[in-house]
């Protein structure tokens, strides 16, 4: 994946530690690891026909500190409040270890090296210059758009900046990945016990599938868990990288996850020789790559970590070619997707920073109030809305439905005030919001605190008429479905 970027200067500083890249409209923070703490997020926009993920990052370590699907109970990388996120990101966030001639270095672990962060509307890039090792590391994050699975995309590029050939061994990934089915309460209060339910399947395929064996609820009935979290790493041509699911195979006796003892002492052969445990543990998701780089040459690891409701969805998704070109195409789409959303407020003045500010402000309104679209002839529906549950607002329990036409919960005040702009930017909405919010007024005259997802129902009589030409067995199933509350996303899934 070719990402154009400015080379960091060798003394570890750029002119101006904070600036706006006027061409890409990205915010650049040089030497971010030494700056005042900062927390933000990817917008969780995967397209109308895409599965969103939530992803939070900070200006420490490799940025991303927590991500998942839907809400905090479906985390893939554990959710932390901001102050803990700053402490933990360099240990439980993404890690990159590089071994050359028996010496091992961890990328983004030494703030004295030249490093920078580039923040886009739907992307995050970080870069570091390892002067002593004469290597440059570039990491790109973005959300997988317009697919049937929700995933965080991570692209790691290592460049040989020396004048000589280098033979490198690389270990990159997550030291801790939460299996599907483990909620936030279990992670915070009984992780040791919860490990007894955890398992990893399909490790040998290069696409490990993480889930609990059965439901963890303290009830008489036990239910099967079909959903799973997954990870996949590939090369430029699509060859799958070896996945490591047991952190002990890399860190050995260092249970603090600080030093990759096994990898440090014996390299990739030693890691592969370890017998990995695939159950009753809090697993990892690392990928291995060994390569020889000529002067100025680069190697790239393409990684995707996500969540699906069942294996069939994942298997169908993997039928397409997943390679460097796939990642490049999806990154480009992630960028154009948000550009299209904010096109209505595109502003051209003498101040490019002001122009970019208008777009970012408009995007902020979309994320809280939602983006209006028309369903059918006269139905107004808002996609992308959600409660602002970021790292510094840890009290909010946000939700982003993992389905097409995704929507979420919100505070009445936030949603109401952030839809005021639709009067100008989306006049087709008309009086819809007046009707919506006045109908939510309570008998005592007060408004409710929260606004939940919008659902639809169809009367029995109308449903019979709509599906009269459908085969009998399917007709009954569809009628039963639409006569109960449903979302557009679930209806799409039902009909697909």
Annotate each PLM feature.
Residues 2-496:
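Anionic coordination/interaction segments
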């Amino acid at each position: 994946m070719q990402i154009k970027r400015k080379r960091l200067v060798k003394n570890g500083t750029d002119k101006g530690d904070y600036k706006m890249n006027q061409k890409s409209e990205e915010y650049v923070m040089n030497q971010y690891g030494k700056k005042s703490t900062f927390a933000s997020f990817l917008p969780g926009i995967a397209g109308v026909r895409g599965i969103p993920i939530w992803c939070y990052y900070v200006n420490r370590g490799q940025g991303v500190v927590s991500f998942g699907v839907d809400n905090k109970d479906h985390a893939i990388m554990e959710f932390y409040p901001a102050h803990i996120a700053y402490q933990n990101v360099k240990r439980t966030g993404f890690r990159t270890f590089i071994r050359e001639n028996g010496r091992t270095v961890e990328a983004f672990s030494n703030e004295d090296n030249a490093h920078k962060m580039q923040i886009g509307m739907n992307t995050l890039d970080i870069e570091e210059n390892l002067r002593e090792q004469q290597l440059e590391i570039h990491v790109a994050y973005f959300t997988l758009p317009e697919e049937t699975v929700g995933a965080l995309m991570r692209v790691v590029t290592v460049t040989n900046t020396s004048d000589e050939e280098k033979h490198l061994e690389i270990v990159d990934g997550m030291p801790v990945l939460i299996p599907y089915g483990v909620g936030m309460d279990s992670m915070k209060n009984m992780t040791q016990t919860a490990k007894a339910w955890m398992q990893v399947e399909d490790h040998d395929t290069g696409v490990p599938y993480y889930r609990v064996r059965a439901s963890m609820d303290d009830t008489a009935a036990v239910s099967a868990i079909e959903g799973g979290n997954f990870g996949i790493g590939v090369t430029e041509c699509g060859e799958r990288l070896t996945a490591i699911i047991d952190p002990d195979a890399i860190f050995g006796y260092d249970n603090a996850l600080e030093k990759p003892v096994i990898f440090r002492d014996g390299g990739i052969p030693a890691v592969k020789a370890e017998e990995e445990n695939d159950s009753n543990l809090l697993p990892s998701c690392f990928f291995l790559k060994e390569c020889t780089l000529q002067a100025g040459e680069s190697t790239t690891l393409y990684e995707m970590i996500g969540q699906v409701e069942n294996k069939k969805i994942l298997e169908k998704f993997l039928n397409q070619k997943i390679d460097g070109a796939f990642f490049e195409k999806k990154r480009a789409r992630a960028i154009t997707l948000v550009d299209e959303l904010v096109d209505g407020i595109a502003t051209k003045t003498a101040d490019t920073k002001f122009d970019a500010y208008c777009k970012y402000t408009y995007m902020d309104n979309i994320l809280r109030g939602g983006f209006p679209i028309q369903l059918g002839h006269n139905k107004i529906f808002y996609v992308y809305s959600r409660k602002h549950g970021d790292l510094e607002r840890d009290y909010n329990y946000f939700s982003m439905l993992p389905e097409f036409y995704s929507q979420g919960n919100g505070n009445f005040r936030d949603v109401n005030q952030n839809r005021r702009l639709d009067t100008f930017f989306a006049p087709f909405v008309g009086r819809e919001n007046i009707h919506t919010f006045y109908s939510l007024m309570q008998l005592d005259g007060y408004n409710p605190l929260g606004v939940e997802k919008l659902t639809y129902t169809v009367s029995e009589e109308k449903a019979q008429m709509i599906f009269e030409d459908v085969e009998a067995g399917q007709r009954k199933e569809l009628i039963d479905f639409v006569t109960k509350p449903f979302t557009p996303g679930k209806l799409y899934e039902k009909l697909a």
